[in-house]
């Protein structure tokens, strides 16, 4: 991700500017599990280490205490909006160009805790609906890869005293099921190696069932050679056709609709640095801004289909 993080943020800031101009509320979060090693593990006496971020209950999904969601930019920032955007841009520039001395403690790139993020959205989405009084919400999940694995809570003997039982964690397997007592549903698929039966797909499906007025939009950054695997993994028919190849060669983007996502966009990471400025009048209406934004997209050799589709949702 660090090869394209700054280019990705440039695209993000363009989208935020559009939303800001037409008064579309938004929140921008970055997920991370980066933390210094001395924060992670307690000593034999139990001192130090990170506190659990959940009430531990056997057989519930386990979210590691290093997981964090960082709220970088908000539509409610007011006069701080531009400063927040500048901080985000400088951070991404430092990460992409290897200026580690300018990256704050705990803000380096890490794994991909997408599963934990989907779980956290169960609280963020209703809060957003309540705060902004909107009837529909687009939730965008942007990654450069699949989610890292997630565990469940179990009881196990203490490392220091085998006679003492304590909470631990163990990997999910194909016999695990996800039960949502609130809506009365049981999901049978928790296999990590196949999208149709993956825990990520299961969590997304559960999110969609809980919030039917929320579009779950995935954006996946693809490096050279990944597009065929992207199609095989996420297309329901598991078929990468000649038409798919031709479309990718022309637009360097793909639009799929796998179970769990309202829509999933694949974008060539090599094309993210394309940037063209567009201008509108200071007193332009929302319709004029929207028209100028979409007209600008037509001048781009790639990603225009993706961004145009997103604007129309």
Q: Which stretches of residues belong to each language-model region?
A:
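Acidic, glycine-rich A-domain
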Residues: 1-313
């Amino acid at each position: 991700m660090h090869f394209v993080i700054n280019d990705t943020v440039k695209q993000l800031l363009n989208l935020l500017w559009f939303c800001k101009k037409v008064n579309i509320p938004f929140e921008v979060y970055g997920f991370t599990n980066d933390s210094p090693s001395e924060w992670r593990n307690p000593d034999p006496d139990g001192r130090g280490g990170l506190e659990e971020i959940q009430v531990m209950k056997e057989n519930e999904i386990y979210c590691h205490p290093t997981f964090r969601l960082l709220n970088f930019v908000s539509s409610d920032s007011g006069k701080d909006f531009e400063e927040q955007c500048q901080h985000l841009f400088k951070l991404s520039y430092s990460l992409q160009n290897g200026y580690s001395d300018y990256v704050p403690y705990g803000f380096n790139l890490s794994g991909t805790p997408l599963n934990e993020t989907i779980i956290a959205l169960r609280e963020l989405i209703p809060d957003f609906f309540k705060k902004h009084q909107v009837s529909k919400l687009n939730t965008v999940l942007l990654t450069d890869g699949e989610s890292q694995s997630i565990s469940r809570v179990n009881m196990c003997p203490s490392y220091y005293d085998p006679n003492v039982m304590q909470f631990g964690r163990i990997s999910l397997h194909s016999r695990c099921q996800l039960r949502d007592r609130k809506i009365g549903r049981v999901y049978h698929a928790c296999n990590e190696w196949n999208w149709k039966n993956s825990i990520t797909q299961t969590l997304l499906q559960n999110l969609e069932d809980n919030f039917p007025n929320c579009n779950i939009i995935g954006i996946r950054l693809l490096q050279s050679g990944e597009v065929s695997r992207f199609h095989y993994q996420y297309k329901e028919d598991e078929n990468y056709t000649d038409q798919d190849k031709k479309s990718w060669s022309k637009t360097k983007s793909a639009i799929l609709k796998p179970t769990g996502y309202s829509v999933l966009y694949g974008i060539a990471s090599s094309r993210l640095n394309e940037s063209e400025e567009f201008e509108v009048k200071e007193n332009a209406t929302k319709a004029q801004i929207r028209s100028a934004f979409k007209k600008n997209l037509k001048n781009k050799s790639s990603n225009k289909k993706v961004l145009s589709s997103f604007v129309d949702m």
